[in-house]
Design a protein with these regions (language model features):
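Protein-protein interaction/assembly regions in multi-subunit complexes
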Residues: 238, 243-245
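Catalytic phosphate-handling regions of large nucleic-acid enzymes and associated NTPases
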Residues: 1-233
């Protein structure tokens, strides 16, 4: 085989223009940015695996069991899957509305020093809120796709019956795009959703004045700033913590 057959000379600018967007879209869709159901693929795979394991109303099982079963949908290593699972638990306190009822040491999102225990020591099951996330999944409400090796199906989205994407904080950094969605009080969120469905001109700030955070704290903002954030989806504010000693 000649040398010319092994190499193709192409301008680097042409390659970047051709391949950057497909690569960016692959990262955005496949792992980095939460979908409209409020979940990244890694979250969805764990929760759906637990649902199929009948952990919605059943007894807790070892976290190691869930991690192992999740590998059928997610070919990442056990440590990556377990770290993702930890954040979804009540024990870690990272979410305003935890999806996983946990038993054991899952660390704390507010502590850099308090590490979570190994998955062989901790136990998990789906929290009651997941009843509203999975209630109609067997009624042809969402599309399913084959997993990475074509041996089973998994949902593209979860049919949550409330605006879950705003119920918990969700951060994602992709290629050329990033998102950082704060969480909101669930009662206010549901009231605002109902009001908006009844009247699209509803002033959401009157019902849902600002985000709510699982770590608590005092928000520093003005109403006009929050109005701009609600309208554009872009903006920032300060969250002040309190230290008791």
């Amino acid at each position: 085989m000649s040398k010319d057959a092994l190499f193709i000379e192409q301008p680097i600018t042409e390659i970047l223009e051709k391949n950057y967007m497909p690569y960016a879209m692959s990262v955005i869709v496949s792992r980095a940015i939460p979908e409209i159901d409020g979940f990244k693929p890694s979250h969805r795979k764990i929760l759906y695996t637990m649902y199929k394991m009948k952990l919605l109303n059943g007894n807790r099982t070892k976290s190691a069991n869930v991690v192992g079963q999740t590998m059928k949908l997610n070919p990442h290593g056990d440590q990556a899957i377990y770290a993702t699972l930890v954040r979804l638990t009540k024990g870690n306190e990272a979410l305003l509305l935890p999806y996983i009822d946990s038993k054991g040491n899952f660390g704390k999102v507010t502590s850099r020093d308090m590490k979570f225990a190994a998955p062989r020591y901790t136990e998990v099951r789906l929290d009651k809120v997941c009843e509203t996330i999975f209630s109609d999944i067997d009624k042809n409400t969402v599309d399913f796709s084959e997993n990475y090796d074509g041996t089973m199906l998994e949902p593209n989205l979860l049919p949550t019956t409330f605006p879950n994407i705003l119920a918990n904080p969700n951060k994602g950094i992709a290629v050329g795009m990033a998102s950082n969605i704060p969480s909101f009080n669930l009662n206010e969120l549901c009231e605002a959703t109902i009001a908006y469905l009844q009247d699209a001109d509803t002033d959401l700030l009157e019902i849902m004045p600002a985000p709510d955070f699982p770590t608590a704290g005092t928000m520093i903002y003005t109403k006009s700033d929050m109005q701009k954030i609600y309208e554009s989806g872009v903006g920032s504010f300060k969250l002040r913590g309190k230290i008791h000693y």
